[in-house]
Amino acid sequence: FVFIPNVQPMSALLFLVAFSYRLSDALMIALLSLLGTNIYLGMGPWTISQLAALTITIILFHQFGKIPIIKKNRFLQAFFAFLCGLLYGLIISLMEVWLYQFPSFLAYYLQGLLFDFFHASGNFVFYLLLWPVFERITPTSYKLAKKNE
């Protein structure tokens, strides 16, 4: 998916983990995934922004995933993954403007909004596409989740 900027399945996979497992498991997997990709692709000051944004969005996704109407509706979960993608971009922008001392948050944020939209749209599509695969790979967690409903 290199030809479409900011569209990767990692966020959607992490949201699936956040929905299906404990919050601590999801955060640990997110931390290791983020550090692994940053070691491979390049680490810099943006790593801290990514870590903060990913942590906040995973916590929100995990908490909202407990709401009964969201818990039972994949489309709503995917839509919330879309919103978390937009929130991720907002948090990154806020931290980057502060870190690099850019004069205008609004100008910086608006410049990256299209990329945030691509990321959010990728979350939506990948969440819906990966759900059945994720369910087959981790059937035990779904059986436990259905028992606890």
Task: Please provide the spans of the model-predicted regions.
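Transmembrane helix irregularities
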Residues: 20-21, 39, 121
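Central hydrophobic cores of alpha-helical transmembrane segments
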Residues: 26-38, 76-85
